[in-house]
Amino acid sequence: MSSEAELNPTTYIQHHLTNHTISVGDGAFWVLHTDTLFMSVLLGVVSLGLIWMVVRKATSGVPSKTQAFVELLIEFIDDQVKTTFHGNRHAFVAPAALTIFVWVLLLNAMDFLPIDIMAWIYEHIFGLHNWRSVPTADVNTTFALALSIWILTIYFAIKVKGFGGWVTELVCTPFGKNPLLWPFNLLLNVIEYISKPLSHSLRLFGNMYAGEIIFMLLGMWAATGVTGTFFGAILGAGWAIFHILIVVLQAFIFMMLAVVYLSMAHESH
């Protein structure tokens, strides 16, 4: 913040909720959130790098603590996929589930960075007045992830059932093959297809955005002397401990919904 005199709830929250953006073209219709893009790509590379490093150092003998943890994580995710997806899960779905979980977990975990310290670093070291560290608190990120999974479900549905079989399923389920019922079947299936990426993305976004707001409120109370620095730190630490559950749980739910949608794409009614 530029001045302590300007510090009030409105300016404090607006400052921390403003993305670093660049406009594409002459107009302002297409605006890129460069902080979201940078952090998403960076953490994607980090997640792949971590997995690659563990795999490269894996041994058949007594595993290291890191290798043992990763093996437990892979086994846990594989068991979750196995209960939902009944095809050849190792060809795509299980590796995709592992990638989604690790990536989204790292994206969510950025919420643990102290917002005021990070804001000071971004502004005074990198010259960035506005920069948001939590990509999943930006609906553009969660919708892009959900939309990618949605496209994959359509791709696999057509691949497994054929284009004709997929269209037939759209117009003939759930009420049957009577031509009089085709419009109702199609309407219900279109609504279902549209609602999947919306609910998938907004669930993750809503939880992470709310968590970020609470961290901001706690930081604002401490900065303005409402709770005091010490008591504010205690409140922040308490919420951070509880937020660990939210961060992990939301990554798990997002991954499992992706597996469920991919499983549905491989099944016939």
From Swiss-Prot:
Ion transport among keywords: yes
Localisation per UniProt entry: Cell inner membrane
Swiss-Prot/TrEMBL keywords: ATP synthesis, Cell inner membrane, Cell membrane, CF(0), Hydrogen ion transport, Ion transport, Membrane, Transmembrane, Transmembrane helix, Transport
Signal peptide: none
One BP annotation, GO: proton motive force-driven plasma membrane ATP synthesis
Molecular function in Gene Ontology: proton-transporting ATP synthase activity, rotational mechanism
Domain of life: Bacteria
Gene3D superfamilies: ATP synthase, F0 complex, subunit A
Membrane association type: Multi-pass membrane protein
Role, per record: Key component of the proton channel; it plays a direct role in the translocation of protons across the membrane.
Family stated for the protein in its record: Belongs to the ATPase A chain family.
SUBUNIT field: F-type ATPases have 2 components, CF(1) - the catalytic core - and CF(0) - the membrane proton channel. CF(1) has five subunits: alpha(3), beta(3), gamma(1), delta(1), epsilon(1). CF(0) has three main subunits: a(1), b(2) and c(9-12). The alpha and beta chains form an alternating ring which encloses part of the gamma chain. CF(1) is attached to CF(0) by a central stalk formed by the gamma and epsilon chains, while a peripheral stalk is formed by the delta and b chains.
Record protein name field: ATP synthase subunit a
Gene label: atpB
